[in-house]
Design a protein with these regions (language model features):
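ATP-dependent adenylation/nucleotidyltransferase module used to activate substrates
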Residues: 1-137, 172-173, 179-180
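Flexible helical/loop "lid" subdomain adjacent to adenine-nucleotide binding pockets
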Residues: 121, 125-237
Length: 237
């Protein structure tokens, strides 16, 4: 996985004409972002000539009693790897409903603001399973072509370039990497609560895959790529 990641990230840096070599990393402490932190460390060491700077930013949503302690523990791990790390605590009033959607929007807003302040790009740890879940949720809600394209490996949002170098990797690949390299991470128990839509969708996709459609994830990814190609053609008209 390290070699594939290096090839992917090097292509992003060199072939996509990215001028900035400074990156803000959204670091939650979960398995995906901690794997990405480890991979970035390896990439930086292996490509010193690129002079890459990465600044992890930990968003403390203040939704759990131990969130501050966990954020500090994640910061200490990042510091031990040589990364200057920032903790930002969300102090705005929490909504009564759809807390996950609120947290996602607040997190992205804060990260993009920091990236703009640092004149940096933003790196997020989304993987292909996240992409599949997102497209599935949007399809149920009747989303159009652009929505059914799903998350992209690179996109512009509020003048900030957002990169997702793990978007073509499956969750099981990330788990294998973490286990093989003894990467420390923190499990957010809310990921298993059925009151959240994404958790329910994840379980539904697994049930469909096991019962009668084992290729559903790959088929949804192909569907995403087809929508991306269609949008490119439409935009040329």
């Amino acid at each position: 996985m390290i070699e594939n990641f290096n090839d992917n990230f090097r292509e992003i840096c060199l072939n996509l004409k990215i001028d900035k070599r400074r990156f803000i990393l959204g670091l939650s402490g979960g398995i995906d972002s901690m794997a990405l932190l480890s991979l970035l460390k390896h990439f930086i060491v292996s490509n010193k000539n690129l002079k890459i700077e990465v600044f992890p930013v930990i968003i403390d949503h203040d939704l759990r009693l131990n969130s501050s302690n966990e954020a500090k523990a994640v910061q200490n791990i990042a510091l031990s790897l040589g990364f200057n790390t920032i903790i930002k605590k969300i102090i705005t009033k929490k909504p009564n409903g759809n807390i996950q959607n609120w947290a996602r929007k607040e997190r992205r807003r804060i990260l993009c603001d920091i990236a703009f302040e640092f004149s940096a790009n933003l790196i997020l740890g989304h993987h292909s399973d996240d992409l599949v879940e997102t497209i599935f949720m949007r399809s149920v809600k009747g989303s159009g072509i652009e929505g059914l394209r799903g998350m992209q490996d690179r996109m512009i949002w509020n003048d900030t370039l957002i990169l997702r170098p793990l978007i073509f990797f499956k969750k099981r690949q990330i788990i294998n990497y973490v286990n093989s390299n003894n990467v420390i991470f923190f499990e957010d128990q809310s990921n298993f609560l059925l009151k959240f839509e994404r958790t329910r969708v994840r379980k539904t996709l697994k049930r469909i895959s096991v019962s009668n459609w084992p290729s559903i994830s790959n088929d949804i990814i192909k569907f995403s790529l087809l929508n991306k190609q269609l949008l490119l053609k439409i935009n040329k008209i």
